[in-house]
Design a protein with these regions (language model features):
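A short, internal acetyl-CoA/4′-phosphopantetheine-binding micro-motif in the GNAT/acyltransferase core
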Residues: 125-135, 160-161
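Conserved N-terminal entry element of GNAT/NAT acetyltransferase domains
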Residues: 2-56
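Conserved GNAT acetyl-CoA-binding A-motif
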Residues: 149-161
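A conserved beta-turn-beta hairpin within the catalytic core of GNAT-like acetyltransferases
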Residues: 115-124, 133, 185
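Acetyl-CoA-dependent GNAT
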Residues: 74-121
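Conserved acetyl-CoA-binding loop-helix of GNAT-fold acetyltransferases
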Residues: 134-149, 169, 173
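Short amphipathic alpha-helix that is part of the acyltransferase structural core
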Residues: 44-79
Length: 194
């Protein structure tokens, strides 16, 4: 229900979505800010560093998304990919977004996020750069999102299409999951279990 309502607001009533997003960001920071400020990842994946998206130049994020092939967005459209949308997400305290940066060349290898809500739920998503696919980074990013989400006390969820084989396998291999509901278009609404 909440998932469907969020998509209606985001897609049809964007002005109301933006207002709710700002309020949620403030309330989330009040409830979880202290825990987040004290949070450190246990370890970085070998060869990569985890960097909060808010610490990455907006233009670099826009460039990352623009370099991905069109098919990468078939199942991935959680937000806008223009500078204004990215900047707004970087300022949103409830949008826990991270990038994996390749230590050898400084390139962004992947992007992941928990879109979090002050009432204690988070919805995770991720994108692996076209040149880094097949290296297990989707699974790695799921583990990163689980680590931060569970550490601060969120219940985590995700929607994944059974047609998006790589993402589906990544969700299964990184996490204990429970299928909450089968959605139209071969999508699954999953709860990620600790």
């Amino acid at each position: 229900m909440l998932y469907a309502l969020a998509h209606i607001l985001r897609d049809k009533l964007s002005w109301l979505w933006l207002l709710i997003e700002k309020l949620n960001s403030c309330l989330f920071d009040i409830r979880y800010g202290k825990k987040l400020r004290g949070f450190l990842f246990k370890e970085n994946p070998e060869g990569y560093e985890i960097i909060p998206m808010r610490d990455i130049p907006t233009e670099e994020m826009v460039s990352f998304f623009s370099q991905q092939p069109e098919e990468a967005f078939t199942f991935f459209h959680p937000h806008g990919f223009d500078a204004k949308s990215i900047k707004r997400l970087q300022q949103n305290r409830s949008f826990l977004a991270y990038i994996l940066r390749d230590k050898t060349n400084g390139k962004i290898a992947g992007y992941c996020f928990n879109r979090s809500f002050f009432h204690g739920q988070g919805f995770r998503g991720r994108m692996v750069d076209i040149n880094y696919r097949g290296k297990g980074l989707g699974t790695t990013m799921n583990k990163i999102l689980n680590e931060v989400g569970f550490a601060i006390g969120l219940r985590l969820f995700e929607t994944v299409s059974k047609d998006n084989v790589a993402s589906y396998k990544s969700a299964l291999s990184a996490s204990n999951i429970k299928v909450v509901k089968e959605l139209p278009d071969n999508d699954l609404y999953l709860e990620i279990l600790p």
